[in-house]
Amino acid sequence: MTSATTWRYTSGMFKTIIEPFKIKVVEPIRMTTPEERRAVLQQAHYNMFNIRAKDILIDLLTDSGTSAMSSEQWAAMMRGDNAYAGSNSFYRFEAAVKDLTGYAHIIPTHQGRAAERILFSSVCGKGQIVPNNTHFDTTRANIEATGAEAVDLVIPEGKQPQSRHPFKGNIDLNKLEALLKDAKPGQVPLCMLTVTNNSGGGQPVSMENLRQTGALCRRYGVPFFLDACRFAENAYFIKLRESGYQNKSAADIAREMFRLSDGCTMSAKKDGLVNIGGFLGMNNADWAQQARNLLVLTEGFPTYGGLAGRDLDAIAQGLQEVLEEDYLKYRLRSVEYLAERLDKIGYPIVQPPGGHAVYIDARALLLHIPPVRFPAQSLCSAIYEHGGIRTGEIGNAMFGRNVEGKEIPSDMDLVRIAIPRRAYTQSHIDYVVEVAEHVYKLRETLHGFRVIRQSPVLRHFTIEFEPV
């Protein structure tokens, strides 16, 4: 591994890394006032998911499905073949995914959670265990819906926001081996690794950790799958931070990552650079047939999987563009740029910055708000009220639990500032910094929330709050 001081994204003799694209189509932003936004918050019951897009100046809730597509992707969409069976678009899509992953079976889905549902419904059941570095929300929910248990085994540094470990997304190999060793035959149907680790700050997984995880799984006869939503960002982190990879291309590194595993789930709405789509890839023919049977039942025929032909062609093109190194250099530097400025203001953030978002440690910032009063939700609300910026809560609302009316807090309360790909410029980010600085000065005046309504599963999408 290289030292942190060499992680800089330099570009020749100039320090400024420009957006490696020109803007061809624009969408107007409607300006709003703080008074309007306070009314919007009340109407939305302080849930960021309930705010309408027309009331948002800059939308940093998620990087999923919010990318701007390229002219080449739009051109590819015109080739879209919408044949119900045997679509030409599918075979172009399949060829692109196989070239990247090397998997024998590629099954399109309308997005990543559909791939998760099909996979886990096929192979998981009551009493089984699925380990991961950290399961994201839909992954955990789809596993638990089968009666299985989702177990998080990220290394200790992954739960320490200020730790500068270069690969905080790594799975704890000792804990993984202990789990596999103690499990009954068939109790662990598969092992997952999320690259990058979204719930832990968008932190990467090293190639060595991927390699050793695969070796452990083979030793115990357990299939090894990736949650590959942000595979390209992970590959570029490996290039920057892991010894022996500096002179390898991001594309070659990504191919090596996939070939260490037996399969993956993928939301193409992230590193596929599209607005909808995903896939399930694997080498096991029996599992693939089970998955296709479920696909036909709920998604569609195996050569379209709930997607139009144009979407399949856009994904095929996006998977090539996302591995262009000028783009990846700009992408990671954009996140680092925001992180540096928030850090300078005084915000406690997850260090080092991840690949798709900056994560503020709201629990550390708002010490006067206890975890059961949702400090991350408080910060999200303040950032929207004062600047019209929508961010995401990755904390107690998303990962905490309510057991018989008592809140069981999550490990961390983070505010995720996720940057959509190729959608905003540096001026937008500079505005975000100004708003964040204003809110920072008001931090001691922020209040907590109590829950007034919630769902039993994935409650953060529909939860309703009131101030306390």
Question: How would you describe each model-predicted region?
Answer:
Residues 282-283, 360-362, 419-421:
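Short beta-strand-to-loop capping motifs
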Residues 71-78, 362:
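A short, surface-exposed helix-loop junction/capping segment
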Residues 9-11, 322, 398-468:
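PLP-dependent enzyme catalytic core of the Aspartate aminotransferase-like
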Residues 276, 356, 413-417:
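Short amphipathic alpha-helical segments
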Residues 303-381, 385-411, 446-457:
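Conserved small-domain helix->loop->beta segment predominantly found in fold-type I
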Residues 288-289, 367-375, 422-431:
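Short, conserved charged micro-motifs
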Residues 7-10, 14-48, 52, 56-67, ...:
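Conserved PLP-enzyme active-site core in the AAT-like
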